[in-house]
Amino acid sequence: MLQFLTFGPMNQISGDPIRLRHVLLGCTCVLALTGILPSNLIAQSTSSPNSTPEWHQAVAAFQALASAHENLTTFQVFGTSDVGRPLHLFTIGSPTSDLRILINNAIHPGEPCGVNASIAWATELLENPEQIPDNTCIAIVPMYNVGGGLRRNCCTRANQLGPEEYGFRGNARNLDLNRDFIKCDSRNALAFNEMFVRFDPDIFVDTHTSNGADYQPALTLITTQPDKLGGPLAAWLENDFAPQLYARMAKRGERMIPYVNSIESTPDGGIVDFLETPRYSTGYGALHHAIGFTTEAHMLKPFSQRVSATLEFLRVLLETAAEEGGYIRNLRQQQRAAFLSSDLAPVAWEADTTAIDSLSFPGFTARYEWSNVTGSRRLRYDREAPYEKAIPYLHTFQPTRFAPIPEAFVVPQAWRHVVERLDANGVEYARVPEDTTMVLEVTTILAHSASPRPYEGHHYRTVEKVQRSMEPVRLYKGDLIIPMNQSAARYLVETLSPEGVDAFMAWNFFDSALQQKEYFSAYVFEETAEAMLREDADLNAKFEEEKAQKGAAWSSRAQLDWLYKRSPHYEGTASRYPVFSIPKGQPVPFQRP
């Protein structure tokens, strides 16, 4: 059945026939309803091996498939993009199936091979329904970055061979949507969060085209970093599932290697796994215990070859995953339980440079010659000199920061932008029924730093040192009590713990809490400071010790400030992180209904 289902605020559209009609026409629904067969429509949208559909053509192709196969498919609007156009989800099979696979295309519309591959794959499956495994649902986002997709051009991908035209990396607000899955500055990301949690995929694929070195294979793969993923899923992924994907791709003549993230200027010096933290698509998926794969088709291979390699991966993925049946979903349930059984969770990682593996790498010989442009040495890969040799491979990561897993988080309702993102991720919570005071674990930010230049609309902040203590906290009717015994537990820890590499704190959601609001005038405070030292011998001794240590470098203003922060006048909430915790093992009041 051809359906236009909506999530969240888009329900307002589905309930309004006039607005719904406008949405459908904007999606060129008329094409799907006027007898144009999917094959003809697809041929129009990919008129040559070096072309890729425009946004409306991709949407129309999936709409036509849904119209032609109503008993097997749905076509849904799940939100609105920043450019005002709808976001779509095409599904084959029942969303309640034991195995659910989600494919996201054109997060970077200049890298569109997944769009072509997904249309071809869906067509292939629907024309041969016996190839669709039982109890399996496949969901496809035709083009996620709609704004970037509308910005068609020939040339912004300077390193890339084809297609003739493609979209642009940034969205309508010039955001890189593959850095936006936690901060959700875009409407796209907020809608995607909600759709992702509702669909609850077991496997998530994000299709891309690479940058970087030249080498022989047409496809490389970023797999959810196993050490970061952790738990029973990680062992199965690394030792069983991922090796099967590589082996089956090779058997079909489409050799695939890990993503080429070079340690040095060329792969000869080795490669290191790409660490997809939660800002990235598959890193976000890992917060919900989904296995993620990012396909990276090689930029210098012909576009048709990149599409073919991506298509083959989708086929192999479905075939391999279907053999596991409901095993993956059972592993994910075990993963959630394993996470909650721990007292601490890693929230930042780095490559372990002491654990070096070896990878047989099919590359091209790198040569250096003099540039006719700059007069300096330049790099050239010699395709007439291919090689296969072992190179160092850094595949092991270790945590660098941990955060406690509490019994519950407490989030004041004042931080509404955080609450909005929690809602999008299906977080369950209770509201404080009346104003009250609770003794909670309070985190004070003792050291932090921010990037001097903006990055994706923010000055990224790193929290370097915190202190936790139990203190009375004033709460107000409507504040959130968030128990951890829920499926979103890992998402909560990694976004609400200030140490998290992609926590809300890192993306400036709580910056105003760091600022001191009241100060003193020295000429007024001098008498108070003198009285403090006279009446408190211990304070006076500590003050003299500080003076001796800092000497002449300790200015008179700094000395008074030291005393001010130990006086009753100091507000005490500056640098107090405004999310609180109920430590593990303690009772949680106001349980959710």
Description of each model-found segment:
Residues 2-8, 12-22, 41-593:
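Structured catalytic-domain cores with a bias toward divalent-metal coordination
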